[in-house]
Amino acid sequence: VQPFEVSPILFSFGLFLRLISIAWNKIHIEMVVHAPSESGSLIRLLKSLDAADYLGSTPSLTIELPQQADPQLLHFLQQTATFTQLSGHITLRRRIQPHHMDSAESSLRTVESFYPLDPETSHLLLLSPQAELGPSFYHYLKYTVLNYKQSARAKSVFSKLIGISLELPFSSPTADGKSFAPPEMTVKDKEQLVPSFLWQAPSSNAALYFGDVWAEFHSFMSNRLSTPESVTAPHTKLISERYPAFMEQLLEMIRAKGYYLLYPSFPGIKSSSIATIHDELYQHPEEFGATNPSVDERKNDPIGLGSGEQPLSHASNIMALLDLFPSGLPDLDALPLLGFNGEQLDATAYSKQTEEYLQQFRIYYGGCAKDTKTDDPSADLFCLQE
């Protein structure tokens, strides 16, 4: 680990001493991106990653290549002068199997692309090749991870937070693809946007997932794929085929465990964002490719990934962004919470929906009988011994 480097951001909230006390340099973020067969958009992402400020500790980047890798991308990666910061930090993994992946294979490949060395300090930043990140994205991630995951307060408060999205989508990832606007809160009798909110929706565009949660997702996927479904189980796909297949299983785990991600509202408040998702070079996931008629019909779909392509901030740090948090980052229980369908929930509705879906999941997908009793159903989604 490289020595701790002092950045201007660290002085803004009296963080310097706090960061030392909770071992800033023990936090490791590993970046993963799955390359499509045509990688023009990925090259744009790589350039933005190389231009970011990593506070003296460049994270690793794993690029998952398809069987038919783009020669232009390979040539770009082989040029010695291509990178300044990412040089020596990139790992390529190329798929061997010649056939197109189905949904199960794609989900497994995504989940297996990362496993934390230390679940408490190693975290996954999953990126879409359509993404482009601002130079200060790493500042924001470190700051929010420290506050909501690694701080003494975060460790003392029970939380269902599993990750942090860098982008604000302007449409829901669900199959209906309906437009989305961040929630408002009433402050001093006025409706206004808050800088962040919680949402029970997974993201594959630009999202950090905590290491312990991704390790749990490994176990979930192993049990999910090996447990026979009930003959009465519904097969309605909730996540749009614009997104990778693993999102469907991750949504299942999120709903069954009552999890949520932290999403930013500030792209809707400020004129720029720390992450934007481009649509002009968008390609559908391989597992939902040309053999699927429903995808063919949407190849000219202008929605793409529904990000709205917010202008990207080129600020070298997030000092201006942190003006939105004059008292520091808010407590999670003070933020609006949305269900997976975008409906705002209070604590009672949130608990009720989680309990109802949990019971359905255990019966339909967990191999559990209706009358199965357990002290903590959320800790035992699967009845593997029945």
Question: Model features per residue range: what roles?
Answer:
Residues 1-126, 131-386:
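Peripheral/terminal regions associated with large enzymatic or DNA-binding modules
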